[in-house]
Amino acid sequence: MFAVIKTGGKQYRVAANDVITVATLEGEAGAAVTFGDVLLFTDGDATQVGTPLLSGIGVTGEIVQHGRTRKVIAFKKRRRQNSRRRRGHRQDFTVVRITEISAGGKTSKAEPRKTRKAEPAAESAPAAAE
């Protein structure tokens, strides 16, 4: 089950438990966010395409973190005139984990993440030199 959502002027294909990076969203880390602009939805059997949007389908996510990208340098130089301009820009972004896609009576929820515990390595005794 997946959906295509629109946020920040871009489109993203999302499924439950996906992690996507989008333009800045309001809210603190851990807050829930709902995406209302759903363009396409499929549950494996049938596909619904909006004209342009679908109604009755909800995509819910959780804000993981906010951040900024690497600095992009814009450098202008006019030759032989000792004229230079150096300007930098860093774009803000938000990382979101999709928790649920719901359509009518069908729901696709993200399963809890399984974390592996580091198993202690079997300690081998040093070989005795005889």
UniProtKB/Swiss-Prot annotation:
Basic and acidic residues: bias regions: 108-120
Leader sequence segment: none
Composition-biased stretches (Low complexity): 121-130
Any one of the GO BP annotations: translation
GO terms under cellular component: cytoplasm; ribonucleoprotein complex; ribosome
Region Disordered: start-end pairs: 103-130
Key words of the record: Ribonucleoprotein, Ribosomal protein, RNA-binding, rRNA-binding
Any one GO MF annotation of this record: rRNA binding
InterPro entries: bL21-like (IPR028909), bL21-like_sf (IPR036164), Ribosomal_bL21 (IPR001787)
Main function: This protein binds to 23S rRNA in the presence of protein L20.
PANTHER family, alphabetized: 50S RIBOSOMAL PROTEIN L21, LARGE RIBOSOMAL SUBUNIT PROTEIN BL21M
Family, as annotated: Belongs to the bacterial ribosomal protein bL21 family.
Subunit note: Part of the 50S ribosomal subunit. Contacts protein L20.
Stated name of the protein: Large ribosomal subunit protein bL21
Taxonomic source organism: Methylorubrum extorquens (strain PA1) (Methylobacterium extorquens)
